[in-house]
Amino acid sequence: MLSKIAKLPILKRLIPSLAIRILKLIGKNRGYYSIRGINMYLDFLDPIDREIILFNEFENLEIEFLISEIKRKKLNYFLDVGANCGYYSLKIAQKISNINIFSFEPNPEAYHKFSKSLLKNFEFSNNIKLENFGLSNENKKLKMQSMIKFGYAQTGGSTVNEKSISEKHHEFFANFKIGDEYLNLSNNNLAIKIDVEGHELNVLHGLKKTLDSNKCILQIEIFNNNFKEVDNFLSYLGYNIFYVIKKRSNYFYSNFKIN
């Protein structure tokens, strides 16, 4: 009921604004929240965390569609590339008990939140392998940036960017690895979610062998400025778009026939 009330247009703006000021003032902006049966460690100052707290969901259309395809196609691995606070990984572990999940998150603050959530959801510990590095086309440290708002460096939207943007961004270096070298998967059925804020092509180049040697459904966020490059690369590997959620730039590809 509260999540429905919070979605009313005027309250959708008013509630977060008031809550941010109060929680920051008393120093209680982070902690554990029960989100549809999952205990998640979240920070109200982070916009994605805040959406999960207020509405008990995030990218619900994408997650429900992805879960239905994993079940329908009997996929046995889920790769969460850009896992952030772990919402996708935890939801999929909750809904599909026998799936193997690899979660990759280079931002140390996001990794910290996800790790604390895993401690409170012990039943998923055998399903989820969480790594504190990102995927790319080379093994190296890369400079990342996060937007600072309300004095907090937001974990959602962290980008790989070698150039300094502004003083309103927090800069840090994070570890990245070539996905193919870490995973070494072949002849399996995979679901892959990639949400890496412009680093998509680098991730895909590092996963070329994995994408070639497995049946895959791929959910990838692609912004307009690099859509053509990413789409051309995936087309070259034999992947076709079969579903789109345009308002959030999320595209679903597969390299096998979707009925």
Stretch-by-stretch model annotation:
Residues 1-259:
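Phosphate/nucleotide-binding beta-alpha loop and adjacent structural elements of enzyme active sites
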